[in-house]
Amino acid sequence: MNILLISECNKRALVETRRILDQFAERKGERSWQTAITLEGLNTLRKLLRKTARRNTAVACHWIRSTNHTELLWVVGNLRRFNAQGSVPTNTTSRDVLRTKDENPWHSAEVFSLLAAIAGLFHDVGKANALFQAGLSGTGPRSQPYRHEWVSLRLFQAFVGEQDDKAWLTTLSMITSEAEVALLATLQQDKPTFSDSPFRTLPPLAQTIAWLIVSHHRLPVFNKSTELAPNSSEPQLSFAETWLTDHLSPQWNALNHCQIGWTPHEREQNWQFPNGTPLYSAVWREKARKFAGRALKLPSFMHFSQLDQRLTVHLARLALMLADHHYSAGAATVGWQDITYPVWANTDRKTGEYKQRLDEHCVGVGQNALLLGRSLPHLRDTLPAITRHKGFRQRSTHPRFRWQDRAFDLACSIRETSKQHGFFGINMASTGRGKTFANARIMYGLSDESTGCRFSVALGLRTLTLQTGDALRQRLKLDEDDLAVLIGSQAVQDLHEMRKENQQRQQNTPQTGSESADPLFSEHQYVRYDGSLDDGRLKAWLERSPTLHQLLSAPVLITTIDHLMPATEALRGGHQIAPMLRLLTADLVLDEPDDFGLEDLPALCRLVNWAGMLGSRVLLSSATLPPALIRALFDAYLDGRTAWQQAYGTPNTPLNVCCGWFDEFDCQHEQYGDVKDFMVRHDAFVHQRLKNLTKDELPLRFATIVPVSSPSKNADDVYLAVAQAIHPRMFDLHSQHHQQHENGKTVSLGLVRMANIDPLVAVARQLLAIPSPPDTCIHYCIYHSQHPLAMRSHIEQRLDAALMRNDADALWQVEEIRQAIEKSSQRHHVFVALATSVAEVGRDHDYDWAIVEPSSMRSLIQPAGRILRHRQDKQYVPKTPNIYLLSHNIRALRGKDIAYCKPGFESQDDSLDTHDLHQLLQEKEYRHLSAAPRIVQPMSFAKPLSLVALEHAVLGKTLLGLKNKKLDDLKRPPAAFWWRAHPHWNGELQRRTPFRQSAKDEAYTLWIADDDEEPVFMVQDDGPSGWKQSDIARPVTLNMAEGVSAWIEPDYHALYQQLAEEKQWELSWVSARFGEIRLREEEDWYWHPLLGVFGALS
């Protein structure tokens, strides 16, 4: 390809880019180069330019396609040097002709910059106390009864005293050395027996600065401890509005002061300042006068600097924390030190020597916070983006995907409106309709092509995240820098890549996926704006962590939601910074948000609230979204958008969010600022969707309820009874729903789906011991999350191979099925996956039939979606049931009062009158299982509750609360409490309703060091080898009856050997990397290669 390169760099950037470009191309002028180059060479050139890009870099690359046609490929650096076509202006002027600064949409940018700066001056003044200084020198304890930020808060409280905001700010703007004497004289010291809230007496601006000071390491949260603080009472939700002024105490910061080991002298030293505070430093006072003077001259400062301005104060906190991280990591700045003030802020981690003086550190953090705050409004313009992408614009040629074109056109039509008013969209298209790609096209359509497109897709599962990343990369031909996939486990990613490579080697033609009816595009199908981070502080911070760099920089980010959740859920350590910046600079797609457990939904609502507050446009994507969840998420987004419009955009713009609905039948949009009207429109869309589905969809799922009972409630009797109920019915289903080979042998692939691992394994052991009928072989696969990593990946790979049923003849080529037909004498072969919910979400599998243990309505709908998933044709419509639903689950058979739980929605407060599925469901709700019961709310919640009504009722209560119920009577606050009471300044709701709370577990590894050694479990150790043997899981034996075999052979030696050969590694390395499994230490565990790891069964 022939390319033209134009450089508009200045200063040192020009020298650097000339050096690089001269190595690749021939100069055609002072700032232009031309050459013929391969695609690989061009990618290398771009990477080199990006690596050395600085503030003044600006290089455009044009592809000379024909005599009179060039096409812009990419821009590295400053986009403002070029127009959308990559052309350079004829003339430039320094005069502000367009008055662009008069139209700055940020109202509070200078406010949050100055808030961070003033707080930066005070944030560590408490480190001047004698006990902290003794700890730094090594002569005292490393911690103190009261943490330095609490002491800093008390010092700031003393500085403000009884002045109002204007008065104390004026005092700061004229501060002299005498101020410290008055401050120390009025300093309030906390005692173990008494402490009141410092915020009680502070005026609004001072409250904000005080909150920034005390929260610059960790958000205040009530530290509950029956051991250290047995008499302290938990704050009541009904008084949340007064927590700050009436309840806040040192216990919200730490529990150090409650420990009984402190001597009276140490407690005194915590409040003594033998060398004074930084107010003694002339350098500190000079900077304080400057910052306070600027604040007093800013007309909007008082209005935007109150704690109810959520966006402003949280961006101030972000700038402060980032400045603290950045400045603490650097060297000392002598110019900011007063040589007469001998107090230190920190030590060098490597040498242990003193590093930065305290006055210098506070000044440095304040100055850097000011500059960082000022750079935040421009951050979006300096980050990489993609635009003019032909793949997003190309029309679908396959009729099945034409609805994507309508969705894209609608998104383009509301681009400007969504930019001004925000966007909340819902994509409810059915599985197999290309929802993933449609979501990407919708977000691209909403983006301004002049600045490029940036969006994140957040998912709940690693597997689904990897699949989504593959689908988009394959379809859009995006580079790794342009599309980043983050899942938090390099081992899982490695195994996924190896599986993909194996599949490609086995196939004669490249795999093209479900949307590949479109022809492949040319390699150059989009323009990439690389940008260059203007702020060196942010750039330096990002470069310390490749994951953070990817999280913020990638134009398209496919990630497990865990990487974005810290935006609201991280309470300490600055982990909220990167995800907050991502939400500030990119739109958000939530894929299958209803797949999260009930207990995780409040945190999900907080994330959507924060996305609205940070200006993101949000798209929900799922065909099974319950109305209560949609109501809660839209309500959360509305509230967040209100906070955004306070600080950004045209003043007094009414709240009127642009809303969109998409499915394969229709696309609609309207603007709403009210939840009630929004839900009326949503319900109408859903009802029309169901009508369309009734006309369009084939009845491929035909379910019936089968009775199951046990002679006693004893665990062994129950497991045997369930096995005996399942066993004959598998053969019934096989006889009705199988495929026949040309040699007369029959094969069916079935799913037996159970709720929990331990009962699953218990039932599996019983089934494995029951002989098969004559001339029949049953092949079992026990599939759940507690197999070591390599084996789980292998199981999934082999299931993928067998259960991709787009091509009917492909089944006979699958290795396990081909061997069973060729080498076995039996005529009938039943392949059964005994699985938990891992067989559903994120697995694009197609089974012939299923037997399902009920735990919720969702537990019935999800497995049903895997029946005849790929064979959408009239010839496959069943005449007899292909789904059997057990009438009772294992908990019910064991006589538990609460049976439809874990997973499920039943609890002591919301219980069912019966556990018999016959009585819990009407025939129309299960006969042809679909998403309908989940996406339409029942008209009544009168008792006795049905299984469908229970689900909707509990969702409503968890997310929105009950009208007549006192908050403090609830075990957990409803999700809506977050955006109704706005306790954003603390982490109390995050403590009470955490995201993905689980028991503490440890990493173990199934270890094979040599071919002739038996596998053993190992755990990491401090010894010379780094590992030691563990007896965490005891091996068990397994009895397999006649006519029973393994579907997927669990041969760990062969599997590890294959991975070792592919990676060119030792077996021990393979074990360490791919043999991991996480287990809770306090439980008894057992292990078998076929069964995986499981708990005690009776």
Curated annotation (Swiss-Prot):
Residues 102-327 form the HD Cas3-type domain. The N-terminus (1-about 100) might be the equivalent of Cas2 in this CRISPR subtype. GO terms for molecular function: ATP binding; helicase activity; metal ion binding; nuclease activity. A motif (DEAD box) lies at residues 591-594. Signal peptide: none annotated. InterPro entries: Cas3-like_dom, Cas3_I-F_Cas2, CRISPR-assoc_Cas3_HD, CRISPR-assoc_Cas3_HD_sf, CRISPR-assoc_Cas3_yers, P-loop_NTPase. The keyword ATP-binding applies. This is CRISPR-associated nuclease/helicase Cas3 subtype I-F/YPEST. In the N-terminal section; belongs to the CRISPR-associated nuclease Cas3-HD family. In the central section; belongs to the CRISPR-associated helicase Cas3 family. Disulfide bonds: none annotated. It comes from Pectobacterium atrosepticum (strain SCRI 1043 / ATCC BAA-672). It is an enzyme of class 3 (hydrolase).
